[in-house]
């Protein structure tokens, strides 16, 4: 699982005037991530499934920042409903965002779930794959025209070391047979990395970078999905490997903001350092196959980019 070696990331420059989207940020590592963007002047879109919980989180963020930082120096928190397990909700979110936001400078695809039993999304996909990967795939592609128009911009996909144990079950993608919580989770996190590499390749030279990362092990609400025995084992192991929340969000902030990554795209990071991927995550064939399959699953039709212009990429509902 790796050591808890990283130090909290120090943001060196303010981001006044920049718009940042963070998915799943009413809890877990998403919340302090949103807080840091807000603290240094960002216009932060809190994209959350539960609006009431997001409002409570936003109030807590504002109070926390006010305690240690002049409030007039902070940015703005904007709450928008986004349920990544529903394609309709994603479309509604994007429509709303396109009406209210002129630019998207940073997209942090952070939201994630685990489920001890097999469940499905509103559209019939296995819940973990549908939320952690496919929902973010659909969201990112629908937002691409606005992101490209805002270049330079960054897309940050939160993955996990669990990808090393994952594989794409091409003939059983929704795990209707032999479902397992970690099988589903590791598949979704591998998919995040394959998507990152394929999208980075397609956006090469267009001013938008795409990177993935492992934040490390931390005490987040995702552990609520663990069963009793696993939770007990986790209780023993946790102190040995768990990162503090400031440590856990370090690599997210690094990938989103650090100037040293201005030209880096398609890579995987942990503890603020580029890491070599396992061989099965480097398969260009699998990345392309997953891309094409994902387009079909969410009902999108892609047209080629022309002359490296943002308006040359058209993605429309089929």
PLM regions and their residue ranges:
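Rossmann-fold NAD(P)H-dependent dehydrogenase/reductase core
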Residues: 3-230, 298-309
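Universal eukaryotic N-terminal targeting presequences
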Residues: 1-2, 317
């Amino acid at each position: 699982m790796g050591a808890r070696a990283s130090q909290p990331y120090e943001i060196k420059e303010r981001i006044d005037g920049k718009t940042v989207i963070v998915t799943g940020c009413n809890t877990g590592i998403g919340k302090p991530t949103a807080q840091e963007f807000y603290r240094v002047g960002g216009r932060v879109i809190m994209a959350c499934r539960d609006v009431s919980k997001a409002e409570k989180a936003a109030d807590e963020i504002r109070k926390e920042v006010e305690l240690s930082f002049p409030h007039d120096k902070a940015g703005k928190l904007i709450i928008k409903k986004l349920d990544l397990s529903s394609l309709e909700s994603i479309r509604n979110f994007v429509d709303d965002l396109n009406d209210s936001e002129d630019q998207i400078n940073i997209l942090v695809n952070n939201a994630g779930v685990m489920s001890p039993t097999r469940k499905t999304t509103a559209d019939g996909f296995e819940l973990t794959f549908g939320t952690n990967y496919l929902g973010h795939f659909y969201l990112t592609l629908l937002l691409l025209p606005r992101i490209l128009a805002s270049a330079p911009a960054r897309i940050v996909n939160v993955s996990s070391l669990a990808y090393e144990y994952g594989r794409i079950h091409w003939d059983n993608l929704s795990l209707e047979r032999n479902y397992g919580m970690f099988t589903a989770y590791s598949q979704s996190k591998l998919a995040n990395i394959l998507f990152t590499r394929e999208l980075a390749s397609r956006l090469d030279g267009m001013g938008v970078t795409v990177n993935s990362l492992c934040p490390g092990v931390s005490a987040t609400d995702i552990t609520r999905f663990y069963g009793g025995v696993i939770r007990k084992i986790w209780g023993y192991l946790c102190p040995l490997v768990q990162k503090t929340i400031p440590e856990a969000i370090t690599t997210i902030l690094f990938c989103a903001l650090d100037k040293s990554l201005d030209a880096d795209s398609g890579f995987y990071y942990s503890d603020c350092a580029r890491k070599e991927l396992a061989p099965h995550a480097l398969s260009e064939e699998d990345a392309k196959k997953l891309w094409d399959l994902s387009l079909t699953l969410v009902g999108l039709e892609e047209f080629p980019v022309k002359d490296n212009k943002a308006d040359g990429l058209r993605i429309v509902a089929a």
